[in-house]
Amino acid sequence: MVHNFIEFETERLKLRRFKDEDLEYFYQYRANPKVAKYQGWQDYSYEQAISFIEKQKIAIANIPDTWVQVAIELKDHGRLIGDFGIHTLELPLNSIEIGFTLDPQFQKQGYATEALNGLVNHAFNVLYKEKIQAIAVEQNDSSIKLLKRIGFRQVKKIENSPFKGQIVNEFVFELTKVDWVG
C-alpha cells in the first residue's frame, strides 16, 4: 500500500498535515532564536512561514530524496506544538531521515518522546521502513538524549562540519526495524 502522507495519533497527540490555522503558532516557534539554534534556519520570517505551510498542505510523502513536514498537534486543544521533518532517502532503500522541532513552552513534558515513539512505530509498521536516521549537532544535548531514549544508536561522527558560519561536529544516529522490535 502506498501512503502519500503520514497521519496518526498517540495518546495525547495527533500527527497530521499542516493547515492554515497552524500559521501563527508555527511562525511563533520557528522565529524563536532558541528553537532555531540547532536548526537549518535563522531569522525566520512570517512570509517564509506562509510559504512553508502552503507547500506542506499539499506535500506528498515517500518520494525519494524529498522532505515533508508533519504537524504535531495537541489533541485536547487542537493546537500546533511542533513538527517533524521526514526525508525519504534514495539509499539505503526503505530508509528515512528525520528532524524535529517542538515549541519551547511544550518541551520537557514528554511530548517529543511520545511523538517520536509514534513516528518510529508508524514508520516501521505502517510505512514499512527498515531504517531511520537523524543527525544532531554535538552541542544539542536535548535531541541527542531524546534519540538515545527511543533506542537510536550513534553510528558516525562528522567532524568539522560547517553549520551557520561555524565549524561543528555532528553525530549521525540510526534505528533499524530489527533493533526496534528487538
Where are these regions (language model features)?
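Hydrophobic residues in alpha-helical segments
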Residues: R30, Q39, I60-N62
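Acyl-donor (CoA/ACP) binding surface of acyl/acetyltransferases
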Residues: M1-A36, I72-G182
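Secondary-structure boundary/capping residues
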Residues: Y44, N62-D65, I132
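A short helix-loop-beta-strand connector motif used in the catalytic cores of GNAT acetyltransferases and
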Residues: K57-A71
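Conserved GNAT-fold acetyl-CoA-binding loop/helix
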Residues: K34-K57
